[in-house]
């Protein structure tokens, strides 16, 4: 497996989990909500680079959909512009390196559609739909991680499946690992 993809998956794991922690922790002030959205978005964009580097178009589409629904949660539009420009640059750079040869499995396409629908549900505050969609999508991303030997993606998707399961069961999240009934 490509070392670049492994490193990117590790960065995405840290950014996604930390951003998620800041994003949903209701004890924190509102500034952490915007910061959490930005860090989570960095994780999305890094996962787009991972998807491009392994040539999995469905992962790219899923992460781009998540990023699209995360952008309105920012307060700082300069950060939004910088992240969008970073995404365009990575798409061109990694696309050229792969000769724009991408694949998409049926499982990846289904996971992508489910993740994007979950992101839409998040934007509309339909939490039950979001939780179920993201658990299903992250289970598929665990499979993609195993298939491509991406430890960072495996850990991140596993963490999000666990978080989703606890939310479905009615637990309230506090921080990265803290839950109360």
Predicted features along the sequence, with ranges:
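Alpha-helical membrane-protein topology signature
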Residues: 1-181
């Amino acid at each position: 497996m490509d070392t670049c993809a492994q490193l990117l998956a590790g960065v995405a794991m840290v950014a996604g989990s930390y951003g998620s922690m800041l994003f949903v922790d209701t004890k924190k002030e509102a500034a952490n909500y915007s910061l959490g959205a930005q860090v989570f978005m960095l994780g999305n964009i890094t996962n787009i680079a991972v998807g491009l580097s392994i040539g999995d178009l469905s992962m790219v589409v899923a992460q781009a959909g998540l990023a699209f629904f995360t952008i309105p949660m920012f307060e700082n539009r300069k950060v939004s512009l910088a992240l969008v420009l970073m995404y365009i640059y990575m798409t061109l750079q990694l696309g050229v390196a792969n000769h724009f040869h991408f694949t998409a499995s049926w499982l990846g396409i289904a996971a992508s559609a489910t993740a994007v629908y979950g992101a839409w549900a998040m934007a509309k505050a339909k939490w039950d739909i979001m939780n179920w969609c993201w658990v299903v999508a992250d289970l598929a991303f665990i499979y993609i991680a195993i298939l491509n030997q991406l430890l960072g993606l495996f850990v991140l998707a596993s963490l999000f499946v666990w978080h989703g399961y606890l939310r479905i069961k009615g637990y309230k999240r506090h921080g990265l690992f803290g839950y109360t009934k």
